[in-house]
């Protein structure tokens, strides 16, 4: 039920006016979800690129414990007709924390490309697939996806996908450099951190999942009766405020129930000391734990970043920490278990 709930609330936020965007420029980008849809001009046509991860919820824990092999799906299609472009050659680069993990050519005659990620502890990524004889680009073997095996998705946080379109309609004709659309996208891998907190002599296990960056310093404040944790964050207000960029911070906190930290039945949330209770969502379906979601969209992130820069006296670009606090409260966000029993995951067609 946790996966279903996570998918439903993320999809609902994707349909919100605050998170919907379509840009028609040579280079477009977003900032972190399980799926992004970006648009760019392609001559006299508008090309949309859909990038999505399957399954939608991937974490370092599911990769390690379940040997999960997530797939990244790319679909380039005409915005007006909704038909795939044919003979598409993609030049795809994947980065993590500024380090290039993969950079290569991929081709699909039908415009749909699927890359299966096989996370492994090895020095570099190896790519397995048929080589197209014209473009010397990796393509699928029958119905099997291209496979990228190596040190990818082993760490949680944001992964940067840079996708350049080299051919469309005719695989033998490479588009001029100044006519090649470039899409910048960020997909999130959940970083799982566990801690045991001493609450008035009782040991309470807590799990925090971040879909933005690594979590650190999980503590309990007895005076405030709060669970606290931190996350690295770039307070680059120019990047955050860019109309072309979506920013979405999703954190999950798992709290056993009944326990001193779930006894009130509801929760208040704070980010950098700012009350964000209105963006908390609580999954109460599980009888043994509450799963509390911080779902912070771009307008709130902009305000939090602006206040942080004012307090620190910094300029528009600074690397720092973002703090989170969660407090059990009868006046906070309550569990939404009853309404979620009828929710089903959405299967978005390629």
Tell me what each language-model feature is.
Residues 68-72, 225-227, 245-251:
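Structural beta-strand segments of beta-rich domains
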Residues 100-135, 275-285:
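Solvent-exposed serine/threonine-rich low-complexity stretches and specific carbohydrate-binding patches
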Residues 77-108, 263-267:
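Short flexible loop/turn segments that cap and initiate beta-strands
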Residues 1-31, 74, 269, 332-350:
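Secretory targeting signatures
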Residues 239-263:
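Surface-exposed beta-strand/loop patches in extracellular or lumenal glycoproteins
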Residues 23-87:
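Beta-strand-rich domain onsets/edges
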Residues 166-173, 329-335:
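Short acidic/polar inter-strand loop motif in beta-rich domains
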Residues 33, 167-203, 343:
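Short beta-strand elements
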């Amino acid at each position: 039920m946790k996966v279903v709930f996570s998918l439903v609330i993320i999809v609902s936020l994707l349909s919100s006016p605050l998170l919907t965007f379509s840009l028609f420029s040579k280079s477009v980008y977003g900032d972190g979800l399980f799926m992004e849809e970006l648009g760019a001009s392609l001559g006299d046509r508008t090309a949309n690129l859909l990038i999505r991860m399957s399954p939608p919820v991937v974490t370092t824990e599911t990769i390690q414990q379940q040997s999960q092999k997530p797939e990244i799906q790319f679909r380039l299609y005409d915005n007006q007709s909704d038909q795939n472009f044919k003979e598409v050659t993609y030049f795809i680069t994947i980065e993590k924390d500024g380090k290039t993990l993969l950079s290569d050519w991929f081709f699909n005659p039908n415009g749909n490309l699927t890359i299966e990620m096989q996370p492994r502890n090895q020095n570099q990524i190896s790519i397995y697939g048929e080589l197209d004889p014209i473009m010397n680009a990796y393509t699928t073997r029958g119905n099997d996806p291209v496979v990228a095996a190596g040190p990818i998705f082993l760490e949680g946080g944001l992964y940067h996908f840079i996708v350049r379109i080299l051919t469309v309609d005719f695989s033998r004709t490479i588009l001029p450099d100044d006519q090649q659309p470039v899409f910048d996208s960020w997909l999130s891998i959940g970083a799982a951190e566990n801690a045991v907190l001493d609450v008035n002599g009782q040991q309470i296990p807590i799990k925090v999942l971040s879909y933005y960056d690594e979590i650190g310093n999980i503590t309990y404040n007895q005076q405030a009766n709060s669970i606290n944790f931190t996350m690295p964050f770039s307070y680059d207000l120019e990047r955050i405020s860019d109309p072309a960029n979506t920013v979405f911070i999703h954190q999950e906190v798992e709290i056993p129930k009944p326990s001193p930290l779930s006894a009130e039945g509801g929760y208040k949330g704070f980010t950098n000391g700012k009350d964000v209770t209105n963006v908390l969502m609580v999954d109460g379906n599980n009888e043994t734990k509450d799963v509390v979601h911080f779902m912070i969209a771009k307008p709130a992130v902009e305000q939090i970043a602006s206040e942080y820069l004012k307090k620190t006296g910094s300029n528009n670009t600074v690397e720092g920490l973002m703090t989170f606090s969660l407090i059990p409260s009868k006046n906070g966000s309550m569990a939404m278990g009853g309404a979620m029993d009828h929710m089903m995951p959405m299967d978005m067609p390629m």
